[in-house]
Amino acid sequence: MLTKERKKSLIDSFIYALESSPVILFVDFSGMSVLESNDFRLELYKNFGKDVVFTVYRTSLLKTAVKLANKELEDFEKFFEGSTGVIYAEESDPVDVLKAVKKFSESHNNKPFIKGGVLEGKIFDAAKAEEYAKLPSKQELYATVVRSLNSPISGLVNALSGNLRKVVYVINAIKEKK
C-alpha cells in the first residue's frame, strides 16, 4: 500500500511531466512479462540514458494528477483503461522516443502498445503515434538541411576547380609546343 507521501510524490512527478516534457506516451503493457518489462526499460536506458522514464501509475493517481494540472480529464481517460504505463522524456527528441518504443513493440508482439500521448502539449491517439513514428528525427532533418546547403557550395567549388584545371591544361599544352 502506498503512503500519502508516496502518492503525493507520484502525482507531483506526473504533473511535472505533463507541464514540462516534450513527449508523454501512454502504453498498454498488459501481457508483458516482468522480464520483457525490464528489457523495455533497459532498451530505453540504452537509447536515452536517464532522460526517458517508464513508470507505471495507478489509474486513480493519473486522474488526480490530470485534474490538479488543470487538464481536461475526458481527453485523457481513454489512455487510462487497462494496464497503463507512462513514458516521458525531458530533453530527448520526441520522434526518437516514439521510434524506439515502436521498434521495441514491433519486435515483441506489439507489446507495449502505444495508446496515445501528448506531444508538445497536443494530445494524440494511437493512429497519430504511428504517423509520428514515421517522421524523420531532428538529427535527420538537420543532416538533410546541411546536405542541401552544402550541395550548391560543392557544385561551385567543382566548377571553379574545373576551370582552373582547364587553364593548367592550356598552359601545359602551350609549354609543350614551345
From Swiss-Prot:
<dbReference type="InterPro" id="IPR001790">
    <property type="entry name" value="Ribosomal_uL10"/>
</dbReference>
<keyword id="KW-0694">RNA-binding</keyword>
<comment type="function">
    <text>Forms part of the ribosomal stalk, playing a central role in the interaction of the ribosome with GTP-bound translation factors.</text>
</comment>
<dbReference type="GO" id="GO:0006412">
    <property type="term" value="P:translation"/>
</dbReference>
<comment type="similarity">
    <text>Belongs to the universal ribosomal protein uL10 family.</text>
</comment>
<keyword id="KW-0687">Ribonucleoprotein</keyword>
<dbReference type="InterPro" id="IPR043141">
    <property type="entry name" value="Ribosomal_uL10-like_sf"/>
</dbReference>
<comment type="subunit">
    <text>Part of the ribosomal stalk of the 50S ribosomal subunit. The N-terminus interacts with L11 and the large rRNA to form the base of the stalk. The C-terminus forms an elongated spine to which L12 dimers bind in a sequential fashion forming a multimeric L10(L12)X complex.</text>
</comment>
<dbReference type="GO" id="GO:0015934">
    <property type="term" value="C:large ribosomal subunit"/>
</dbReference>
<dbReference type="Pfam" id="PF00466">
    <property type="entry name" value="Ribosomal_L10"/>
</dbReference>
<keyword id="KW-0689">Ribosomal protein</keyword>
<dbReference type="GO" id="GO:0070180">
    <property type="term" value="F:large ribosomal subunit rRNA binding"/>
</dbReference>
<dbReference type="GO" id="GO:0003735">
    <property type="term" value="F:structural constituent of ribosome"/>
</dbReference>
<protein>
    <recommendedName>
        <fullName>Large ribosomal subunit protein uL10</fullName>
    </recommendedName>
</protein>
<dbReference type="InterPro" id="IPR047865">
    <property type="entry name" value="Ribosomal_uL10_bac_type"/>
</dbReference>
<dbReference type="InterPro" id="IPR022973">
    <property type="entry name" value="Ribosomal_uL10_bac"/>
</dbReference>
<keyword id="KW-0699">rRNA-binding</keyword>
<dbReference type="InterPro" id="IPR002363">
    <property type="entry name" value="Ribosomal_uL10_CS_bac"/>
</dbReference>
